[in-house]
Amino acid sequence: MNHEASNAQIMRGPAVDDLLKQILLTNETTRNELSYRHNYERNPQVLRDFFDGDLYQQSLDEGKFSDADDCAVILFTDAFVKDKKGTHTFNMVHLVILNFDAKIRYHQKYHVRLAITPGPSKSSLDSFLLPILAELYFLETRGGDIPAINFLSRVAPHQSAYPCKYCVHRAVHPQSRRHGTYLCRTDGEMRTLEQYRHGGPGRGIFGPSIFAGLDIFKGPLTFQIEELHTISRGGGFLLYAMLTVDNSKTTKYYHKMDPDLEDYERETYPFFVDKRTMEEIGQQIEETRKYLPVTFEGSFLDMIKQTRGTRAVDYNDFMLYIVPTLIVSKIRTRAAQQAITKLVRGCSIALQRKLSVDDLNEMDACFQVFFRFASLR
């Protein structure tokens, strides 16, 4: 046995086929609940569920999901650590059955945990996913289809030159900065199905996606983006960092006078709120805890003073409730206040369970206000 083989890690998990058969055949009540997808009535003017999206609609146009018992599933993955030091990193592979009503499918009993990849370091997910994908391919071709798999698009990370999963647009560095990359426009060329099938390192796709062999594969549409990481942990955390610059030692949000000098225009930073004011806001947050119902899970602490252990949902609450009520009025200029308010409003709309065409138009308009303001700074 060679060294590589002796260090191989083995993953054991349930068979997807057996799990679906158990759900479909052993419980009549559960079987009736699974008819939600087949009976779903779509309103073209409203987005309420996965079944309103382009990926599922394209699949219907291709003749897929014609049987009432066809099962739609989606895969999620996320990394986590088991201790505060983060010495062991694991990845969870999670399956959600979309046939259940959106009002109940998020309950734990409707989820299937397929695998947890072993540590101590972040493992190569491809090797662990291949058996699962092989089984999904068998189910797809021999009995049933899958509408979406949210995993491993092969697109370069967000710090790279072409970070977007959906469009081909080169990121740029801020003026007088050698680090940090941003997408300044929203009119980039959309990525194609062929780029995902064959790869294109020169345009930010390192290789063909391991999902490309599935008949349901639709390139960028296959890789969904969920709100936990994009809005809460992404936008919420970024907004927190932008507004608490005086409470930290970071200078990355200040305009740099010269790339070779450590001179920053702190006074002209549009979202500046002084440290003392932010600390007072943190105390106000702490004082409101006694008014929170005991049935609420978790605790909302003074995030200004301590962020250790802060969850994505806490950054989400900070953005949606603390920023507009306690912080916006402390920002110096009316234009900057409006930009932050519109950003928060856009994120709030995006988090709604149901979106109309008017909602989408308002959301786009809100984000445009913030982006225009940011591009002028």
Tell where the protein language model's regions lie, with residue ranges:
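Domain-level detector for long, ordered catalytic/regulatory cores in large eukaryotic signaling
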Residues: M1-E41, F138-G309
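Structured nucleic-acid-interacting core domains from mobile-element enzymes and related host factors
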Residues: E4-T89
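Acidic, metal-ligating active-site segments
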Residues: L55-S59, F65-S66, C71-G119, H169, ...
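Secondary-structure capping and boundary motifs in well-ordered enzyme cores
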Residues: F65, D69, A156, T277, ...
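Conserved, non-catalytic sequence blocks in retroelement Pol enzymes and Pol-derived host proteins
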Residues: K82-K85, P118-L125, G309-A312, K330-R334, ...
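Short coil/turn segments at secondary-structure boundaries
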Residues: G86-F90, H107-K109, D126-L130, L152-R154, ...
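Alpha-helical bundle/repeat cores within regulatory domains of eukaryotic proteins
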Residues: A335-R377
